[in-house]
Amino acid sequence: MENVEAIVARLEKLEFHVKLLAESLNHTENPIASLVVDFNWSSQDLDCAHDIFEMFDNKIREKSEINWHDLEREFSRKLNISYQGLKSVVLSFNRNGQWTEVCHAYAASFGDSVSLELKSIAQGKVR
């Protein structure tokens, strides 16, 4: 059995390699992989994000009234994602062609005060 120092050294080397690989990810071509690495998400965290988007997608399909602050609260509560971080999440999922109706509706909910990052989604120009 390897000693603890050797195991720690191997883990540190693997962490370094993963960081280098993460830096090589193109957020436009691989938006979800880049997001997962940037936010240090597990597969369960990614599933949770999908669950949140699905909940709001269902509200849109049911034509329910939506308070978009609830989306922000869900991401904050379940994944510790700030408003700034949520913009990255929305951009990534939209670029990946996932939950695009939710992404568009969320971005459009800001009206004329939509952030620069989300403006193209609100206008329906980005995917």
Regions inferred by a protein language model and the residue ranges of each:
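Long, leucine- and charge-enriched amphipathic alpha-helices
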Residues: 1-35
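Amphipathic alpha-helical binding modules
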Residues: 76-127
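Amphipathic alpha-helical interaction modules
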Residues: 25-80
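Intrinsic-disorder-associated interaction segments
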Residues: 7-10, 14, 42, 64, ...
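Short, charge-rich amphipathic segments
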Residues: 3-8, 37-44, 117-126
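Short, well-structured alpha-helical interface segments that form or flank functional binding sites
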Residues: 6-9, 13-16, 44, 48-51, ...
